[in-house]
Amino acid sequence: MTLRELIAQAAEAEVGVRETKTNGGKRIADYQSCTWLPVGAWPWCAAFVDFCVKSAVEKFGPVTFALPRTAGAWDLENWCRSVDDTVKLKKTKQGIATVQRGDIVIYKFSHVGIATSSLDDDGDVSTIEGNTNSAGSREGDGVYRRTRNVSQIRSIIKFTQ
């Protein structure tokens, strides 16, 4: 099984997790503990992604890159640039992107999620995102399935292992 598939499965296993207080709760603390910041009441969408990558790597086995530990959505781009070429950053141009299941999808509005599909004919991608809500906010209350249009995507991180 590919690392990308394991990342998607890790995200799917978390759907339905909800905060028990603003930006907090037992499971949210688990996500936040995957970053370099101390656990606290701070936005955790990137921490959720870090957690999913870490969970997938634990099943996949050794990888040649350092795990992401950032607490910022756009900082994941910097992490990607700092690791070896088994992790690739793809910047979108004019709304054109190639998204695959298990990719990290970084949005223009400083939010991030995990793709669970490729783009459909309308340019939409299914994702799972932490710290969102049913309306799609970047500051929400849990882990949700979302559908986003490619026009909202800033960049994509792809794993080649």
Regions found by a protein language model. Name each.
Residues M1-T64, I157-T160:
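N-terminal capping segments
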Residues G24-R27, D124, E139:
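Glycine-rich, flexible loop/turn motifs
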Residues Y144-Q161:
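Low-complexity, Gly/Ser/Thr/Pro-rich intrinsically disordered linker/tail segments
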Residues L3-A8, K59-S137:
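...with weaker cross-activation on analogous glycine-rich loops/strands in unrelated enzymes
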Residues I28, T70, S82, R146-N149:
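Positively charged, low-complexity intrinsically disordered regions
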Residues G136-R145:
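Aromatic- and Lys/Arg-enriched surface recognition patch
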